């Protein structure tokens, strides 16, 4: 399963671990993703989304129905 938020589009980025002696080793910064079921009142069903913490806050603010319409406009299937 890909590490991409379905709401924000956040995905892993690369960077460095930096030790006290300034040695650098490559690493990945992965988004804080959770699989969550949301109740959609208009469709009378649950929708399962893989969202980041930021994506959950966006859903709380805008509402699940508006977020789903944005996802569907992008062409993603939900």
From Swiss-Prot:
GO molecular function, one example? structural constituent of ribosome
In Pfam terms, one family for this protein is: Ribosomal_L28
UniProt GO cellular component terms: cytosolic large ribosomal subunit
Q: Where is this region: Disordered?
A: 1-24
Coiled coil stretches, renumbered: none
The answer, when asked if rRNA-binding is one of the entry's keywords, is no
Q: Which GO terms describe its biological process?
A: translation
The UniProt keyword set, sorted, is:
Ribonucleoprotein, Ribosomal protein
Q: What family, per the record?
A: Belongs to the bacterial ribosomal protein bL28 family.
UniProt-recorded name of the protein: Large ribosomal subunit protein bL28
Q: Which species does the entry assign this protein to? A: Chromohalobacter salexigens (strain ATCC BAA-138 / DSM 3043 / CIP 106854 / NCIMB 13768 / 1H11)
The taxonomic lineage of its organism, from the top, reads: Bacteria, Pseudomonadati, Pseudomonadota, Gammaproteobacteria, Oceanospirillales
């Amino acid at each position: 399963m890909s590490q991409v938020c379905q709401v924000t589009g956040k995905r892993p980025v690369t960077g460095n671990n930096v030790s006290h002696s300034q040695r650098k080793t490559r690493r990945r910064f992965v988004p804080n993703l959770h699989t969550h079921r949301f109740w959609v009142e208009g469709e009378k069903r649950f929708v399962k989304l893989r969202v980041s913490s930021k994506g959950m806050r966006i859903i709380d603010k805008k509402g699940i129905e508006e977020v789903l319409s944005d996802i569907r406009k992008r062409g993603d299937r939900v």
